[in-house]
C-alpha cells in the first residue's frame, strides 16, 4: 500500500527527478483536504457497528430466506461470519479512504474474495446488496446527510470524498460479481 506521498516520491525517484509541478499540486490538495478525510474516516469508524449491522439486516429483510433453516445466515455461527466479513470490507474501505489509495483493499480484501465465497457456497447477490447498503450509509455520513450519526461528520463540500468512498465500494461489488 502506498499513500499519496509515497506514490509521488516513488514515481519521481523512478524518473530520477524532483517532486514538483502537478505532483506537488496534487499533494498540496491532498493535505488541504486532509481534515475532511480524517473526519470521514472517523465517522465511518465511530459508526462501524451500526453500518455493518444495518447492512446485514437490510440484506436479510430483502431476502428473508437467508435466515431460514437452509439459509446462509441461519445459524449464529453463519450470522457472525456474515457480520465479520462485512466489517472486514468496511475496515479496508476505511483504510483506502484514509490513504487515498485502493491497493490495500484490492490486495488484502478483494483478491480471491469471489472465489472464496463461491467455494463456501455463499451467494454473491446478498453480499453485493449488503455492500450497496454500506456504500449508501457511508456516503450519507460523509455528505452529512445521515440522521443516525454518533459524532460530528465532515463539514464543507465533501462530494469528492464521498465519490471516492463510493468508488471503493464499487470495487468490492465488482469483485463479488
UniProtKB/Swiss-Prot annotation:
Which amino acid positions bind 15,16-dihydrobiliverdin, per UniProt?
Answer: 50, 54, 61, 148
On whether Cell cycle is a keyword of this UniProt record, the answer is no
Q: What residues does mesobiliverdin bind to?
A: 18
Which GO terms are recorded in the biological process aspect for this UniProt protein?
A: photosynthesis
What compartments host this protein?
A: Plastid, Chloroplast thylakoid membrane
The protein's matches in CDD domains, at most eight in alphabetical order, are given as:
PE_beta-like (cd14767)
Q: What cellular component GO annotations does this protein have?
A: chloroplast thylakoid membrane; phycobilisome
Query: Record's superkingdom?
Result: Eukaryota
Q: Tell me the function of this protein.
A: Light-harvesting photosynthetic tetrapyrrole chromophore-protein from the phycobiliprotein complex.
What else is on record for this protein? The light-harvesting system in Cryptophytes contains phycobiliprotein complexes. Unusually they are composed of either phycoerythrin (CPE) or phycocyanin (CPC) but never allophycocyanin (APC), with only one type of biliprotein being present in any one species. Unlike cyanobacteria or red algae these proteins are not arranged into higher-order phycobilisome complexes, and they are found in the thylakoid lumen.
Q: Which family does it belong to?
A: Belongs to the phycobiliprotein family.
Q: What is this protein called?
A: Phycocyanin-645 beta chain
Organism listed in the record: Chroomonas sp
